[in-house]
């Protein structure tokens, strides 16, 4: 770890906390220049009267939370929203609300870790976890990033197809995403604030486009408010339950926790002053709350629109609506039967156009395009931070995005060429499940490290935080178990059960290890092993020196 000063000793112990020039307990001189990322620009924080709230200071801290909130608005979330609306109407709006609150709590921990330690979650994982579990953990997060990027590619390809009235085939839209990704790489050359402003513009486009759909759909406000504030689901069965757990899995993204812990490092914070750290934590929490409130409203727009337009609609009804509209050529995408319509982000845009005119279709596609493009860039940042943090490996932006986008495009373009649109949308649903399955590999580490007094000092999680975040972890594990139990019977061949068993064993092995180290961080001394005492007492001084020399 570059520039580390020897750790402060705990009473009678040979262990100490991470201590660097940016640590709250070690304001000593810097030994070597810090490791930089391509977001190395630091935004200065204006001086204001101590103990008072300042809009100027809030504005200076504004940015990381809105970049983080984009993961709550990616094409995977949009598809989850519209499917929940089509399947359950307004009955699952309260699930969306509380999933967003749970997401805010996780992001709060991520921001706090970055502010207090001056290091992102990937860097802290590199310091504390041994090589083998650290490498496996890194691979799982990379898998989550590639999965998220695939969703962005799918959403963008469908948006181009809708905007071109089908002239750009799906595989063509997938290939276009290669070009537009590298175009966005040049944006950060114009400064961090301009980059953050551009992301703000994309969020505004989503708010306006999906807000327009909400206005023209005119959902019933009384039913909407009941669905939002009454935690119940009358008459619901297995499909509604599956959508409910899908909402939680789509909202809380594993790579986003790693991303947020790194983005907060872009602000100049004097970590030698506890008051400045406390103030930064407060302003970042306010900003994240505002950003996720905006993302919640946008998600609500989508779920409410499709709860109004699609709920309990049959394929025959959708066919008739389109056949009698100016978009009658699209009617053929709906089978002529009385089965409940299975909606996706493509069919969603079509039915909006059939119901409310072609403008609604094109505006939907623009919003979908904004969702895909904004998520593309945040995924690139997350990949860069994760690779640098876990591996101490610096790649150029071009090389990093080429790796991620290649891994995302190859399977996506194969599905787009050799299968149909329904398979592409089905792949999107499967990727939402993947994100949920990988979520413990972000939540467990952030809960572990933010609960360590040796690392976080007075900013470690209190009892209430530990109870709430542990409850989130239990909820996530229950959701994953439900997904697995629901999915296993659909495996096409008995041979797949063997592969599933191997993957499950590896998954449980890593999860068990992370739970064990989390228990150590919470003070379970009876579980301690000599090679893992640092989860209880902090890092050995020679460990930190080794990082410095490395």
From Swiss-Prot:
Residue ranges of the region described as Disordered: 1-45
Q: Which reaction does it catalyse?
A: Zn(2+)(in) + H(+)(out) = Zn(2+)(out) + H(+)(in); Fe(2+)(in) + H(+)(out) = Fe(2+)(out) + H(+)(in); Mn(2+)(in) + H(+)(out) = Mn(2+)(out) + H(+)(in)
Q: In which tissues is this gene expressed?
A: Macrophages; peripheral blood leukocytes, lung, spleen and liver.
Please, which domain of life does this record's source organism belong to?
Eukaryota
Q: List all topological domains (Extracellular).
A: 77-85, 164-167, 218-240, 308-349, 419-429, 489-496
Protein's UniProt keywords contain Iron: yes
Q: May I have one GO cellular component term?
A: lysosomal membrane
Q: Where in the cell is it found?
A: Late endosome membrane; Lysosome membrane
Q: Which residues cross the membrane?
A: 59-76, 86-105, 143-163, 168-187, 197-217, 241-259, 288-307, 350-369, 401-418, 430-450, 467-488, 497-516
The Gene Ontology biological process annotation of the record reads: antigen processing and presentation of peptide antigen; antimicrobial humoral response; cadmium ion transmembrane transport; cell redox homeostasis; cellular detoxification of cadmium ion; defense response to bacterium; defense response to Gram-negative bacterium; defense response to protozoan
Q: What is its main location?
A: membrane
Give start-end positions of Low complexity composition bias. Answer: 11-23
InterPro entries per the UniProt record, alphabetical: NRAMP_fam
* Induction of the gene: In response to lymphokine or bacterial products.
Which residues does the annotation flag as glycosylated?
A: 324, 338
PANTHER family recorded: NATURAL RESISTANCE-ASSOCIATED MACROPHAGE PROTEIN 1 (PTHR11706:SF52), SOLUTE CARRIER PROTEIN FAMILY 11 MEMBER (PTHR11706)
Function per UniProt: Macrophage-specific antiporter that fluxes metal ions in either direction against a proton gradient. Localized to late endosomal lysosomal membranes, delivers bivalent cations from the cytosol into these acidic compartments where they may directly affect antimicrobial activity. Involved in iron metabolism and host natural resistance to infection with intracellular parasites.
What is the similarity comment for this entry? Belongs to the NRAMP family.
Q: What is this protein called?
A: Natural resistance-associated macrophage protein 1
What is the source species?
Homo sapiens
Task: State which gene encodes it.
Answer: SLC11A1
């Amino acid at each position: 770890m570059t520039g580390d000063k020897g750790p402060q000793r705990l009473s009678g112990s040979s262990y100490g906390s991470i201590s660097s020039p940016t640590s709250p307990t070690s304001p000593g001189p810097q030994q070597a220049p810090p490791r930089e990322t391509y977001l190395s620009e630091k935004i200065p924080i204006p001086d204001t009267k101590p103990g008072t709230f300042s809009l100027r200071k809030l504005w200076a801290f504004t940015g990381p939370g809105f970049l983080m909130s984009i993961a709550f608005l990616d094409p995977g979330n949009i598809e989850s929203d519209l499917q929940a609306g089509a399947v359950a109407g307004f009955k699952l709006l309260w699930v969306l609300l509380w999933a967003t609150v749970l997401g805010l709590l996780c992001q709060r921990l991520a921001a706090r870790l970055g502010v207090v330690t001056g290091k992102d979650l990937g860097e802290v994982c590199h310091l504390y976890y041994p090589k083998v579990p650290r490498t496996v953990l890194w691979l799982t997060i990379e898998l989550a990033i590639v999965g998220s990027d695939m969703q962005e590619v799918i959403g963008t390809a469908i948006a181009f197809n809708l905007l071109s009235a089908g002239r750009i085939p799906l595989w063509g839209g997938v290939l276009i995403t290669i070009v537009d990704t590298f175009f966005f790489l040049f944006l950060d050359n114009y400064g961090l604030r301009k980059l953050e402003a551009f992301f703000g513009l994309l969020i505004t486009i989503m708010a306006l486009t999906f807000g327009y759909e909400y206005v023209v759909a005119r959902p019933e406000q009384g039913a909407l408010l009941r669905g939002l504030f009454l935690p119940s689901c009358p008459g619901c069965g297995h499909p509604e339950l599956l959508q409910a757990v899908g909402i939680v899995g789509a909202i809380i993204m594993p790579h986003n926790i790693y991303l947020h812990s790194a983005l907060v490092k872009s602000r100049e914070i004097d970590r030698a002053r506890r008051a400045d750290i406390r103030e930064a934590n407060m302003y970042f929490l306010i900003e994240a709350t505002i950003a996720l409130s905006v993302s919640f409203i946008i998600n609500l727009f989508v779920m409410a629109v499709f709860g109004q337009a699609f709920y309990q609609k049959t394929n025959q009804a959708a066919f008739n609506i389109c056949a009698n509209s100016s978009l009658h050529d699209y009617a053929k995408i709906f089978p002529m039967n009385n089965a409940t319509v299975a909606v996706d982000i493509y069919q969603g845009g079509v039915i909006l156009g059939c119901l409310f005119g072609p403008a609604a279709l094109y505006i939907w596609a623009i919003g979908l395009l904004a969702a895909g493009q904004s998520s593309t860039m945040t995924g690139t940042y997350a990949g860069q931070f994760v690779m640098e943090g876990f591996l101490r490996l610096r790649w150029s932006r071009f090389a990093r995005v080429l790796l991620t986008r290649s891994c995302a495009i190859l399977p996506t373009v194969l599905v787009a060429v050799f299968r149909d649109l329904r398979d592409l949308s089905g792949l999107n649903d499967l990727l939402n499940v993947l994100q949920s399955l990988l979520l413990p590999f972000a939540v467990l580490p952030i809960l572990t490290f933010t609960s360590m007094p040796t690392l976080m000092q007075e900013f470690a999680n209190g009892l209430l935080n530990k109870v709430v975040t542990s409850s989130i972890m239990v909820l996530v594990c229950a959701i994953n178990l439900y997904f697995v139990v629901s999915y296993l019977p659909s495996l096409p061949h008995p041979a797949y059960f063997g592969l599933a068993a191997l993957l499950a064993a590896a998954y449980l092995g890593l999860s068990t290890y992370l739970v064990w180290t989390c228990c150590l961080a919470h003070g379970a001394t009876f579980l301690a092993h000599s090679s893992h005492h640092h989860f209880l007492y902090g890092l050995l001084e020679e460990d930190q020196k080794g990082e410095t020399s490395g």
